[in-house]
Amino acid sequence: MTLKEEFATRNFSIYGQWLGVLSMILCFALGIANIFTFRLLLIIFSVICLVSSFVILFIEVPLLLRICPTSSTFDDAIRKVSTNYMRAAAYLVMGVVQWLSLLGGASSLIAAAVFLTLTAICYALAGVKGQAFVGSKTLGGSGVAQMIV
């Protein structure tokens, strides 16, 4: 199944997974970009954003749990985030944290907050519509993800 065919299925978990990948890239880039400032609150939220990018990486690409040496506690925590509702909750929490970064003043972390919130909405819509989680083949789903989880 090509990427175009995956998007044509109208399964919101596929949209959520790809928005999650975009969120990961944004969180990584913006976390690094905003860490070089003199505002302590912004530095704290930048570090949280940077950590979120690595958590998202393990959530969206489950093959990495097999490849990377991580603790069993971390593996168990990531494996619990397997349903659409759990993913929506995880992304919503990360999004709310980034929205809270605006308390210290406007910054580019708002882009991460927007994408994390959009990802949470996609996963929540997939859950509400009763769509089963379908992993993108491009990201290691359909067979590879099932073997690991």
Curated annotation (Swiss-Prot):
GO cellular component annotations of the record: Golgi apparatus; Golgi membrane; membrane
InterPro entries linked to this entry: TVP18/Ca-channel_flower
Positions glycosylated per UniProt: N11
Predominant subcellular localization, coarse grouping: Golgi
Keywords assigned by UniProt, alphabetized: Glycoprotein, Golgi apparatus, Membrane, Transmembrane, Transmembrane helix
Family (UniProt): Belongs to the TVP18 family.
Function of the molecule: Golgi membrane protein involved in vesicular trafficking.
Protein name (Swiss-Prot/TrEMBL): Golgi apparatus membrane protein TVP18
